[in-house]
């Protein structure tokens, strides 16, 4: 600072002055004016003293030492003694200066106010003793509110602890940081955990820490809690729980459950509810001692609701009770030895592995000793339907046809395998007769055949099917129309016939053999004697001749020739080639039909061509041959033949054209002659018509000249007649108009009088109605007045005046009285007696009332 000699120190301020001779600093406080000496130096400008307001404090580093009277101690040289490295907490007091060496470590700070449900975690830095006890360095304790904490230099505030609010159905989980006693004076070891469930604010102890806030699990009649013990302990009810033990807590135990610190919530278990048509199988059920019975089962039937205990599980879940109708059954197998009743009610012993069957109608829930193998239903079968059944004990297979059948416990459905070509033919669904010309149709998706169903095939009319039984080693032929049902060991005989044109082998696959009549077409190549090679397209009509269809030997002949089409075509072609090879082309061209028919059918004893060609091996008969086309194989021969044919056609065409032209010219001449004659005839007719027209014109002129005068006279007469008729009609119309006008006026007057009468009637009715209503109102008013006043009151009012007058007259001695005033009633009580003189003097009566 500047070297000023005079320093004015305001009140509550101070300066530090350094004596440069002794190198000692001192404090000068105001208010004063300080004159600096030459050997002194002011270290700083005047500074305000430290003022600690109420409920505040400050911390002084290296404080000065004071005696018992709180006076500052100085050493021998006049330097203030300091407690170096120490601290002093100063509370509210008079303003004070800082001596040289003192430092304001913590400025003016409000005292810590500890609220309710709050505490300060304190730790002793040095050994100390206060009103609450003695503490050594390292001790920890709580300063609980409400209150104001006065800090001390030996104590450190570690943290502020807030109370934890415990609500309903809540608890806090505490852990001990070291050995201590909890709020309930129970000893706790380091690391121990426990729960506090008391509702309200809980302030943890100094060695307690809040691990978690645990919410209670609300239990209902449909929910339970699965608990597992993580450590051996005793529960709240005193029961011992071992490590790993599991149990359920239900609503019967408590409505809201807070798990213990050594309890682990495995999960929430929902109630299992069974209705009257359900059951379940519990695996490893818990016994009466509460322990699971491993490897055992228990069946529970509805109606029932229960919780699965820990370790229990449902086998296949909740299952429906088997409700069997009359056409259903269950195949059962015994898993253990059990006593049972058969269908007749007899006691039987079932051994493990035994199979039996129960039939409906019944409601069945299998016990644990029984296993349901399969549920059987009766298979409905028509007369033409069947199934293959195999006995699993003997292995025999049989076919059941034409009746509904339910498999027994020792039977099963057997699948019959068929060759692939047979499967294809059966699945194609083609009609053997209508679709016989189709070779390869579009591939259609067909459902796979049920191999357990009996294989059936409908044999069409006039067809045959051969079935071979491999077990009996014999065959049978079925003629249509018929339905073939294959037995377990039977197979169809598949025909492989030649097809297409020319014939190729193995083109047609068929199960049934058509007996005809039918035809087949083939193309063969022949060569004449002059080496002319020709191609002929022929069609043969054929059929099978069967005399006795019931004869198995004759019926089996049909299938002795595997490919009767190919064999027949080859035999016929061979005969034709042999016959044609011996004739010239010209002869064959002229007599092709006779040569081919004679070659095919042959001649009888009379040298006539036979009617048919018979194959004795299978009774096939060819009845006719149709030659469709004959073409040379050689191209030059074909061209020459075609050219000659075209030339012949051209010559024929020209001849026909000339003939047609000549005929057309002849017809044209005839038409022209007829036309000319018609024209002449028409001219003659026209001249005749012209003559008649001239005659009519002359007659018309005569009539016109004489008819003008006649027409004028007739018109005048007609005009006069029309005028007279008009006058008559006008007079008639005028009279009718007057009559109509008179009638209209009369009708108007009648309606006016009628309306006036109706108006008067309505008015009179309204007057009458008004009078009646007024009378009713008066009557009602009078009745209500009478009812309101009362009949007794009216009577008293009516009799009050006359009675007083009678009493007054009697008092005057008058024996007869007649009052004829219109406004008062007449007293006739004693008038008649008075006139006759019979009235006695009135006795002196004592007045009543």
Swiss-Prot record:
Q: Where in the cell is it found?
A: Cytoplasm; Nucleus
Q: Which Pfam families match?
A: MVP_shoulder (PF11978), Vault (PF01505), Vault_2 (PF17794), Vault_3 (PF17795), Vault_4 (PF17796)
Could you confirm whether the keyword Metal-binding appears in this record?
no
Q: Which UniProt keywords apply?
A: Cytoplasm, Nucleus, Repeat, Ribonucleoprotein
Primary location recorded for the protein, binned into one broad class: cytoplasm
Region called Disordered, residue ranges: 430-452
Instruction: Name where the MVP repeats lie.
Output: 2-55, 56-110, 111-162, 163-215, 216-270, 271-321, 322-378, 379-454, 455-517
User: Mind telling me which CDD domains this protein's record contains?
Assistant: MVP_shoulder
Kindly indicate whether the keyword RNA-binding belongs to this entry: no
| InterPro entries, A to Z | Band_7/SPFH_dom_sf, MVP, MVP_rep_dom, MVP_rep_sf, MVP_shoulder, Vault_2, Vault_2_sf, Vault_3
An example of a Gene Ontology cellular component annotation for this protein is:
cytoplasm
Q: How does it assemble?
A: The vault ribonucleoprotein particle is a huge (400 A x 670 A) cage structure of 12.9 MDa. It consists of a dimer of half-vaults, with each half-vault comprising 39 identical major vault protein (MVP) chains, PARP4 and one or more vault RNAs (vRNAs).
**Function per UniProt:** Required for normal vault structure. Vaults are multi-subunit structures that may act as scaffolds for proteins involved in signal transduction. Vaults may also play a role in nucleo-cytoplasmic transport.
What is the recorded name of this protein?
Answer: Major vault protein
């Amino acid at each position: 600072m500047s070297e000023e000699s005079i320093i004015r120190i305001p009140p509550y301020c101070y300066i530090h002055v350094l004596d440069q001779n002794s190198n000692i600093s001192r404090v000068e406080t105001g208010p004063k004016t300080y004159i600096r000496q030459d050997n002194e130096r002011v270290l700083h400008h005047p500074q305000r003293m430290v003022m600690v307001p109420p409920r505040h404090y400050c911390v002084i580093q290296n404080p000065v030492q004071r005696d018992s009277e709180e006076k500052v101690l100085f050493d021998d040289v006049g330097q203030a003694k300091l407690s170096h490295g120490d601290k002093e907490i100063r509370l509210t007091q008079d303003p004070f200066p800082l001596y040289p060496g003192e430092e304001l470590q913590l400025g003016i700070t409000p005292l810590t106010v500890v609220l309710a449900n709050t505490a300060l975690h304190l730790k002793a830095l040095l050994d100390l003793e206060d009103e609450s006890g003695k503490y050594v360095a390292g001790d920890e304790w709580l300063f609980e509110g409400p209150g104001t904490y006065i800090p001390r230099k030996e104590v450190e505030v570690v943290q502020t602890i807030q109370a934890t609010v415990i609500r309903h159905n809540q608890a806090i989980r505490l852990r001990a940081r070291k050995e201590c006693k909890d709020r309930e004076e129970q000893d706790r070891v380091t690391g121990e955990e426990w729960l506090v469930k008391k509702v309200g604010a809980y302030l943890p102890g100094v060695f307690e820490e809040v691990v978690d806030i645990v919410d209670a699990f609300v239990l209902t009649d449909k929910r339970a809690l699965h608990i597992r013990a993580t450590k051996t302990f005793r529960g709240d009810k005193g029961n011992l729980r071992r490590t790993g033990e599991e149990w359920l807590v239900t609503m019967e135990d408590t409505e809201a459950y807070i798990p213990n610190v050594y309890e682990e919530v495995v999960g929430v278990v929902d109630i299992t509810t069974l209705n009257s048509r359900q059951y379940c199988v519990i695996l490893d059920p818990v016994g009466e001692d509460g322990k699971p019975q491993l490897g055992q089962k228990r069946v529970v039937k509805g109606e029932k609701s229960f919780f699965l205990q820990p370790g229990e599980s449902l086998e296949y879940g909740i299952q429906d009770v088997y409700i069997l109708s009359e056409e259903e059954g269950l195949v059962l197998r015994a898993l253990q030895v059990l006593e049972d009743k058969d269908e007749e009610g007899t006691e039987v012993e079932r051994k493990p592995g035994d199979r039996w069957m129960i039939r409906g109608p019944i409601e069945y829930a299998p016990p644990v000793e029984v296993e349901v193998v399969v549920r059987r239903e009766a298979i409905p079968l028509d007369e033409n339907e069947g199934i293959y059944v195999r006995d699993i004990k003997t292995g025999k297979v049989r076919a059941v046809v034409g009746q509904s059948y339910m498999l027994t416990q020792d039977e099963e459905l057997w699948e019959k395998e068929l060759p692939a070509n047979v499967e294809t033919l059966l699945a194609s669904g083609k009609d053997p007769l209508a679709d016989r010309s189709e070779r390869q149709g579009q591939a259609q998706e067909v459902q796979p055949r049920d191999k357990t169903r009996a294989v059936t095939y409908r044999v069409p009319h006039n067809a045959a099917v051969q079935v071979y039984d491999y077990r009996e080693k014999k065959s049978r032929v079925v003629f249509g129309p018929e339905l073939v049902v294959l037995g377990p060991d039977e197979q169809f005989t598949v025909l492989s016939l030649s097809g297409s044109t020319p014939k190729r082998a193995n083109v047609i696959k068929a199960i049934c053999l058509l007996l005809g009549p039918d035809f087949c077409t083939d193309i063969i190549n022949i060569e004449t004697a002059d080496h002319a090679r020709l191609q002929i397209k022929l069609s043969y009509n054929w059929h099978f001749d069967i005399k006795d269809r019931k004869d198995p030997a004759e019926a089996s002949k049909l299938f002795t020739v595997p490919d009767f089409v190919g064999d027949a075509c080859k035999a016929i072609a061979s005969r034709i080639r042999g016959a044609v090879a011996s004739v010239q082309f010209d002869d064959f061209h002229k007599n092709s039909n006779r040569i081919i028919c004679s070659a095919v059918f042959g001649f009888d004893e009379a040298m006539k061509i036979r009617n048919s060609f018979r194959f004795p091996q299978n009774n096939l008969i060819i009845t006719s041959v149709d030659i469709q086309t004959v073409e040379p194989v050689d191209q030059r021969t074909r061209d020459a033949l075609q050219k000659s044919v075209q030339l012949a056609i051209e010559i024929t065409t020209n001849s026909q054209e000339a003939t047609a032209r000549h005929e057309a010219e002849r017809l044209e001449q005839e038409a022209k002659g007829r036309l000319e004659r018609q024209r002449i005839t028409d001219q003659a007719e026209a001249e005749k018509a012209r003559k008649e027209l001239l005659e009519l014109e002359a007659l018309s002129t005569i009539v016109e000249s004489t008819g003008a005068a006649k027409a004028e006279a007739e018109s005048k007469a007609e005009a006069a007649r029309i005028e007279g008729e008009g006058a008559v009609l006008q007079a008639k119309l005028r009279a009718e108009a007057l009559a109509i006008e008179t009638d209209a006026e009369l009708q108007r007057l009648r309606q006016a009088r009628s309306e006036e009468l109706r108006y008067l009637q309505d008015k009179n009715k309204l007057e009458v109605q008004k009078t009646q209503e007024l009378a009713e109102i008066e009557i009602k008013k009078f009745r209500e007045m009478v009812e309101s006043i009362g009949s007794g009151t009216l009577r008293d009012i009516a009799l009050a005046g006359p009675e007083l007058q009678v009493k007054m007259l009697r008092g005057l001695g008058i024996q007869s009285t007649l009052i004829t005033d219109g406004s008062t009633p007449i007293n006739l009580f004693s008038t008649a007696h008075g006139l006759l003189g019979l009235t006695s003097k009135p006795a002196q009566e004592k007045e009543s009332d």
